[in-house]
Amino acid sequence: MSPNQKTVLITGVSRGLGRAMAEEFIRLGHTVLGCGRSEKEIRQLQKQVGSPHDFAVVDVTDDEQVAAWAKRILKSHGAPDLLLNNAGHINRNARLWEISSQEFSQVIDVNLKGPANVIRHFVPEMVKRQSGVIVNFSSGWGRSTAAEVAPYCATKWAIEGLTQALAQELPPCMAAVPLNPGIINTDMLRSCFGGSASGYPTAEEWAKIAVPFLLKLGALDNGRPLTVPIRGAND
């Protein structure tokens, strides 16, 4: 692997932003390691891109699954240069008191515990190597709020704080960044916005801008709340 090629680890690669990023990183010559919950989509993606890329069925809310995945990946590929905690879940549009305990917990588990599980099992090796960038996907709703998405807002505000605290714990050569990807036309957005989601960039359009942006992140970005600079996605 040349010095310019990176090993990129992405959660939530089954569809949406994760899938689009995986395909764009690969197109640019980088090695992608990823996970998702859909066995069908993961198998299809692995067949499509082949080795050295490595995709696995993993539920990031399950710490034991993440631990086993990390053990295998670190042994086979070493620590990633870029770790993208992208997997996410949003509650159905409803007032907070109408959200069941189970639905609330699911949002918390995917959006907050999931990144913590991945960090727990991958970042120690990155710290040992004294290099790497961790990007935890936040949202515009991690810096503002809206009605009927209170659980989602809560998790994204938490991700902002968690990431900035993590940034203070890393050695000077590393970085942890909370990232607002912008507003992108994905299944998640359509569940909130309905038909108006079509007015925003697709995941594939977004990835063409986001991936080069992510590849430029370094130690000087540690702790900085950043936003992908894509036209139309930040309105």
Language model: regions and residue ranges:
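Residue(s) in the substrate-gating loop at a strand-loop-helix junction
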Residues: S139
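The beta1-alpha1 cofactor-binding region of Rossmann-like NAD(H)/NADP(H)-dependent oxidoreductases
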Residues: V57-A68, S101
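Conserved glycine-rich Rossmann-like NAD(P)H-binding loop of the short-chain dehydrogenase/reductase
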Residues: L28-Q44
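Active-site helix of classical SDR
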Residues: I119, T155
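Substrate-binding pocket helix/loop in short-chain dehydrogenase/reductase
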Residues: A94-L96, E103-S105
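C-terminal helical subdomain
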Residues: P172-M174, P178-L179, T186, G195-D235
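Conserved glycine-rich cofactor-binding loop
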Residues: S14-R15
